[in-house]
Amino acid sequence: MVVITIFTIMTGVVLANLPQFRDKTFLDLTAQEVAITIRQAQVYGIGTKVAGNEFKSHGINLDLTADSKMLTLFADYDENNAYDSGENIEQLRINGAANFTELDTSVDSPCTPASSQCRLDIVFQRPYPEAQFKFNNGASMAGGNIKITLTSTKSTYAKEIEVWATGQIIVRTKS
């Protein structure tokens, strides 16, 4: 009888925390997938990924005002260090209870999907692993870092994907 009671209590505790566990795990995996997509753009940019018959810079475009669930991997055909229509190679769509909620740079104030314009381009030019940032279609941002916040729509969990101009990519829990 004691064993059944202990088993019932343990099962109840585990099942009560299951939705939170799933939500947190989904957010962790999605943040890692975003970081891997950024790393893929870096590898394509410094490597030998051919776009047409040439080796082009590659990058990531994130436009929160257009779609807060979409990340685009692109080849920079016109070499303007920004995503233009028709340059996409692959699109990562977040299917689930998470959204990109904020873009923050080391030089500008953060923007959100509610902002009038909230767009980021991260470009890796061959043969260098360093990242170049273009924020809100403006001038390129020299140095520093950017933070992309991914937030769960079901809870208060949030992850930050931080990309440094040196090419380092970090995923951490947002505090």
Task: Describe the residue ranges of each PLM region.
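Short conserved beta-strand and strand-loop elements enriched in small hydrophobics
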Residues: 143-152
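Short glycine/proline/serine/threonine-rich loop/turn segments at secondary-structure transition edges
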Residues: 132-142
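Membrane-proximal N-terminal amphipathic helix
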Residues: 22-53
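Generic structural detector for well-ordered beta-strands
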Residues: 93, 123-125, 149, 162, ...
